[in-house]
Each structure stands twice: as C-alpha cells, then as structure tokens.
Amino acid sequence: MTLTLRVLAPDQSVFDDTADEIILPSTTGLLGVLPGHISMVTAIDFGVLRVLKNGNWDSIALTGGFAEVESNEVTVLVNKAEMGKNIDSGKAEAELEQAKNQLSQNKDQGNSSEKIKAQETLNKAKAWFQASKSD
C-alpha cells in the first residue's frame, strides 16, 4: 500500500505522485505519515518535506501552509515549494548567508516588521539550503 502525495503552491503543482512514507515539517515538529495514517489536518512550517519512494528519499522545500491526510491521500497546500534537486545549493547557501546578515542588522528592532520579515527570509533560506543538500 502507498500514499498519494500532492504538493501545491499558488503558481504550480510541485509534486503529484505516490510515496511509501512522508515526513512533514509541521508547526509542532516533524510528522511522519505512513499508509493507513489517521485522517488529520495540520499546519505546515517553513522546512523540508521528505518523500520516500522505492527506497530513495526526495526533498521538497516548503514555506508555511497546511496538509490534509485522508484515506492514504496527502495534500499539502503551501505558499511556495520547490524540489530539492532543482535548487542550486551554491545560490541557496549565498541566500542563507545574506538572510543571516539581514537578520543581524535588525536584531535590535524588537518585533518590528523589518525584523519579522528578516526572520521569515532566514527561515525560507534555511529550508531551501537544507533541501538542496538533501538530494
């Protein structure tokens, strides 16, 4: 028995295939999904979704959204997603360093919108860098 996984962003369908196991980056931590999993809906955090198929793991970088598990079908709706194998790791690393610098420049601004945006940029950059290194 397998799962059917769909990862959808507003501008594209990133993944639509079967999987043996899925690990989701939920807002409460990593969540493993196997065939026969109980039905549920969970919030998705910035992070890397891992997909096991035929003994091989694939990675998908995600920004926030939601996931629904229902009858061995998993649908992930996120603001942005990209397959790890399509991410240039050098560019992802440079963006991660730039995001770290941007956040450090805003560290004394309390909860200002600039600091919050810098933290979101850093979270996205971390997810893309991790996904680029996972494949």
Curated annotation (Swiss-Prot):
It is a peripheral membrane protein. It holds the Pfam family ATP-synt_DE. InterPro entries: ATP_synth_F1_dsu/esu, ATP_synth_F1_dsu/esu_N, ATP_synth_F1_esu_C, ATPsynth_dsu/esu_N. One of its GO terms (molecular function) is proton-transporting ATP synthase activity, rotational mechanism. CDD domains: F1-ATPase_delta. GO terms for cellular component: plasma membrane-derived thylakoid membrane; proton-transporting ATP synthase complex. It is found in: Cellular thylakoid membrane. It comes from the Bacteria. Keywords: ATP synthesis, CF(1), Hydrogen ion transport, Ion transport, Membrane, Thylakoid, Transport. Produces ATP from ADP in the presence of a proton gradient across the membrane. HAMAP family: ATP_synth_epsil_bac. PANTHER family: ATP SYNTHASE DELTA/EPSILON CHAIN (PTHR13822), ATP SYNTHASE EPSILON CHAIN, CHLOROPLASTIC (PTHR13822:SF10). Belongs to the ATPase epsilon chain family. F-type ATPases have 2 components, CF(1) - the catalytic core - and CF(0) - the membrane proton channel. CF(1) has five subunits: alpha(3), beta(3), gamma(1), delta(1), epsilon(1). CF(0) has three main subunits: a, b and c. This is ATP synthase epsilon chain. It comes from Prochlorococcus marinus (strain NATL1A). The gene is atpC.
